[in-house]
């Protein structure tokens, strides 16, 4: 899997964000073994310490559970996954609204466009 380091935020935060998204999308299913820090660091082309910091954030979020003898697993707690999914969706919605405001649309017009798109998809 590819990682993209694309903005000015610290690298570990970007890695944690991308791993969060992969977990809630199901790339790493609930209860599944999570790759090791070294494997992920190698995939991302970063120092293992940087990836460890990202993993620490995932553990703090409750998305990944560490078992000393069995490694890391993705949480099976659906409420945790649902809350992270909702948070990510809210962040993307806010980014979308900011992008449309940069084009000169106010929030009401942006939300109207979003609603119209949703209605068109449902037809």
At which residue positions do the language-model features occur?
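Extreme N-terminal segment that seeds HTH/winged-HTH DNA-binding domains in transcriptional regulators
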Residues: 1-33, 39, 87-123
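A short alpha-helical element within helix-turn-helix/winged-helix DNA-binding domains
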Residues: 33-44, 58
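Short, Lys/Arg-rich nucleic-acid/phosphate-binding segment
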Residues: 34, 63-74, 78
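Active-site-proximal glycine-rich helix-loop-beta segment
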Residues: 45, 55, 62
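Terminal helix-turn-helix DNA-binding modules in bacterial transcription factors
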Residues: 79-83
């Amino acid at each position: 899997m590819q990682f993209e380091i694309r903005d000015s935020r610290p690298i570990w935060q970007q890695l944690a964000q991308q791993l969060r998204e992969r977990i809630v999308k199901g790339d790493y299913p609930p209860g599944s073994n999570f790759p090791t820090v070294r494997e992920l660091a190698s995939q991302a082309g970063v120092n293992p310490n940087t990836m460890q910091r990202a993993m620490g954030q995932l553990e703090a979020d409750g998305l990944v559970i560490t078992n000393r003898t069995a490694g890391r697993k993705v949480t099976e707690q659906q409420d945790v996954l649902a809350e992270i999914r909702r948070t990510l969706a809210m962040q993307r919605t806010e980014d979308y609204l900011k992008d449309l405001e940069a084009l000169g649309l106010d929030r009401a017009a942006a939300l109207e466009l979003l609603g119209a798109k949703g209605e068109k998809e449902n037809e």
